């Protein structure tokens, strides 16, 4: 239930902030069902528009970043990287592996 929760990002990758009585803290991981739905939507988006993404590679990479960031919040990074490896080109998988630390740093996320 998102009552009383301030969402700083209503689209993936979400960062949901909750007031703990003194300050707002990141409570994104408290909403796994919402994150699972975001992950599912990212996968569907990536699968549904292959020709579009061939022309707009930056948008493709942005959606991959969203999917990876969401998977990290769900502690499913390995599963998502395996998904990328089996469903996309080797170049895409190599890009994801190469960029994972940058993605983590830019989004303020850490591997668990």
Kindly label every feature range from the protein language model.
Residues 2-112:
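Acidic, small-residue rich beta-repeat scaffolds with periodic aromatic anchors
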